[in-house]
UniProtKB/Swiss-Prot annotation:
Keywords: Methylation, Ribonucleoprotein, Ribosomal protein, RNA-binding, rRNA-binding, tRNA-binding. It comes from the Bacteria. It comes from Moorella thermoacetica (strain ATCC 39073 / JCM 9320). The modification 3-methylthioaspartic acid is found at residue 89. Part of the 30S ribosomal subunit. Contacts proteins S8 and S17. May interact with IF1 in the 30S initiation complex. PANTHER family: 30S RIBOSOMAL PROTEIN S12 FAMILY MEMBER (PTHR11652). It holds the Pfam family Ribosom_S12_S23. This is Small ribosomal subunit protein uS12. GO terms for biological process: translation. NCBIfam families: rpsL_bact.
């Protein structure tokens, strides 16, 4: 237990928390341009073709972002909004593309959890 005088001389060191989405540079989202849209396979116990895109952000950093939802309209040169959030079974994928903004259309025929996929409320 340090004395007060010892703490005056040398204060306690702050614990620095490492960012989980460093490419966003403390922003909630960043805009970017798709450089490549492709599918990849997940880690060991899972099996699928996950849709991902390489995105060059406005700050010049290129990241791999996951395209959530069933079906998408993205291709090379599509302008997208990228948010943080990793995909547990895809190594190196630490970002998500926001559906329903810019060039990324919302998911079709989605009735539950619509706000997460940019889907409008269906007509009665």
């Amino acid at each position: 237990m340090p004395t007060i005088q010892q703490l005056v001389r040398q204060a306690r060191e702050k614990v620095v928390r490492k960012s989980t989405a460093p490419a966003l540079k403390e922003s909630p989202q960043k805009r970017g341009v798709c450089t490549r849209v492709y599918t990849t396979t997940p880690k060991k116990p899972n099996s699928a073709l996950r849709k991902v895109a390489r995105v060059r952000l406005t700050n010049g950093i290129e990241v791999t972002a996951y395209i959530p939802g069933i079906g998408h309209n993205l291709q090379e040169h599509s302008v997208v909004l990228v948010r943080g959030g990793r995909v547990k079974d895809l190594p190196g994928v630490r970002y998500h593309i926001v559906r329903g903004t810019l060039d990324a259309a919302g998911v079709q025929n989605r009735n539950q959890g619509r706000s997460k996929y940019g889907a409008k409320r269906p007509k009665k």
